[in-house]
């Protein structure tokens, strides 16, 4: 197994090495898919967003600043693509409210059910808050990285994150969590 660093693989990619691209895809695909699926809630759309992220990586590899994390750069590209898709959807579709799930005993719930409830709560957030929440809380990006990914100021990121956290907490309280 090749243990080349992301920086080394990016240097190879800039030279046209398709094997380097395959290694980068293998290394980062799962994280990007989790991000895209969490934001879009649709497997096909998430797959498309990840595919477009790697196409942009291939086409624009020279724009990558090797002093920064490649994972963060890829998350930024993917999140922007998802954000564009969410804006497109908002223009074309009405928001569908989800039915709340009543939880009698949260201690008896399986981890998968808790995750499903969290995802359900996050899915009800407006697109900006959802993107900020996912990038910051789930993907672990720093506020300045989220700001760069979403074209917001760090203050806007913090404000959106505060509202998103409050909303998610309130939704989870309704489930008894």
Pin down the residues of each PLM region.
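Arg/Lys-rich amphipathic alpha helix in sigma70-family domain 2
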Residues: 59-66, 76-96, 111, 174
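Helix-turn-helix DNA-binding module
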Residues: 123, 127, 131, 135, ...
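Short, Lys/Arg-enriched C-terminal cap helix and immediately downstream tail that follows
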Residues: 87-90, 125, 130, 165-177
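Short, charged helix-capping/linker segments at alpha-helix termini
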Residues: 2, 14-23, 33-52, 154, ...
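Internal acidic/polar
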Residues: 2-6, 91-115, 142
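Sigma70-family region 2
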Residues: 14-15, 40-41, 52-69, 88-90
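Amphipathic, Lys/Arg- and hydrophobic-enriched alpha-helical face
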Residues: 25-43, 60, 122, 167, ...
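Structural recognition of an alpha-helix C-terminal capping motif at a helix-to-coil junction
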Residues: 34, 48-55, 59, 68-80
